[in-house]
C-alpha cells in the first residue's frame, strides 16, 4: 500500500547550502521530518551544480515521517541575469533597457528549463524565456 501523504513543502534553497536554519528548519520541523537527513541528501544531490544557485525543491512529507524531494530547474530570472551579467533587472522594463541577449543564449536557457516548461517544442520554450527577459528589461535579438 502507498504511504499516506501529509503535505507538500515548496522551498528555494541555494545549491549545496541547505542547513537547519530558516527557512529549511522550521518548514520541515512543522511536519516532524528529519531536518539533517534532508540537508545531507539535498547537498549531496546539488554537489555538481554551481554553488549558491537557488534551486526550487518540492518535498513530499509522508505520515510515517519519511519524505521524498524533487528538484526543479533554477528560476528563469536567475539564469537570465547570469547570462546578461546583471545583478538585477530593470525597475522600469518598458523604457529602461539594462542588457541584451541573443537567440543562442535564450536557447541555452530554454534547454536548461525545458523539463519545467509546458512548451511544446524548443521554439515555444525560447519565446517563453524571451517574454521573461523582456519583462526584466532585457533586449532580445532574433526572437519575434
From Swiss-Prot:
SMART domains: RL11. One or more lysine residues are methylated. One of its GO terms (cellular component) is cytosolic large ribosomal subunit. SUPFAM superfamilies: Ribosomal L11/L12e N-terminal domain, Ribosomal protein L11, C-terminal domain. Pfam families: Ribosomal_L11, Ribosomal_L11_N. The keyword rRNA-binding applies. GO terms for biological process: translation. Keywords: Methylation, Ribonucleoprotein, Ribosomal protein, RNA-binding, rRNA-binding. GO terms for molecular function: large ribosomal subunit rRNA binding; structural constituent of ribosome. It comes from the Bacteria. InterPro entries: Ribosomal_uL11, Ribosomal_uL11_bac-typ, Ribosomal_uL11_C, Ribosomal_uL11_C_sf, Ribosomal_uL11_CS, Ribosomal_uL11_N, Ribosomal_uL11_N_sf. CDD domains: Ribosomal_L11. PROSITE patterns: RIBOSOMAL_L11. Belongs to the universal ribosomal protein uL11 family. Part of the ribosomal stalk of the 50S ribosomal subunit. Interacts with L10 and the large rRNA to form the base of the stalk. L10 forms an elongated spine to which L12 dimers bind in a sequential fashion forming a multimeric L10(L12)X complex. Forms part of the ribosomal stalk which helps the ribosome interact with GTP-bound translation factors. This is Large ribosomal subunit protein uL11. It comes from Neisseria meningitidis serogroup C (strain 053442). The lineage of its organism: Bacteria, Pseudomonadati, Pseudomonadota, Betaproteobacteria, Neisseriales. The gene is rplK.
Amino acid at each position: 500500500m502507498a504511504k499516506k501523504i501529509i503535505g507538500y513543502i515548496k522551498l528555494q534553497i541555494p545549491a549545496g547550502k541547505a542547513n537547519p536554519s530558516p527557512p529549511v528548519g522550521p518548514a520541515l520541523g512543522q511536519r516532524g521530518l528529519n531536518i539533517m537527513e534532508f540537508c545531507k541528501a539535498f547537498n549531496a544531490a546539488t554537489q555538481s551544480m554551481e554553488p549558491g544557485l537557488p534551486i526550487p525543491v518540492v518535498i513530499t512529507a509522508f505520515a510515517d515521517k519519511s519524505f521524498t524531494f524533487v528538484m526543479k530547474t533554477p528560476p528563469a530570472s536567475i539564469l537570465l541575469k547570469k547570462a546578461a551579467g546583471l545583478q538585477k533587472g530593470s525597475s522600469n522594463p518598458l523604457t529602461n533597457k539594462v542588457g541584451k541577449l541573443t537567440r543562442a543564449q535564450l536557447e541555452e536557457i530554454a534547454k536548461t528549463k525545458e523539463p519545467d516548461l509546458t512548451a511544446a517544442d524548443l521554439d515555444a520554450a525560447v519565446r517563453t524565456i524571451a517574454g521573461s527577459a523582456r519583462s526584466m528589461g532585457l533586449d532580445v535579438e532574433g526572437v519575434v
